Amino acid sequence: SDITQVPANKRDMGFVFQNYALFPHMTIFENVAYGLRIRGLSGDALASKVREGLAMVGLGNAEQRYPNQLSGGEQQRVALARVLVLRPKILLMDEPLSNLDAKLRLHMRTEIRRIQQDLRITCLYVTHDQKEALTMSDRIMVMNRGRIEQVGTPMELYEDPATPFVA
């Protein structure tokens, strides 16, 4: 359905930015709790959801730390937890792994895919990394200069590329 007339704060979607966009003056707990507080959650219900979100991304022991005390991978997981506790229908991710080293990127690909499947969230994942796209996606849209070249499963794109660019 068309949501263009729905205010952004009323749309049931989450966004994980390339730079994570964590609040540096807030603890990890407070960062994850932020969206829940905006929605009116407080007390034990809020604490429970925050702890569940941090456990989901393997950071249950980091809630009193600050973003500058975490590695890039840990910060990325906090940004993911902050969105996931809201249980959005759609999750938009803009190159969330681009600032990570190769080993951590591989690990986080697996983690993001696992969480996305466990929670059954539709995810629109923007990447320039072919391996990321092929390993994390059910369907891929390949774009070239703002135009769609092909849409299909990873296998369809790999076995039957529609254009030389897709190949």
What residue spans do the PLM features occupy?
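ABC ATPase nucleotide-binding domains
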Residues: 8-14, 18, 22-165
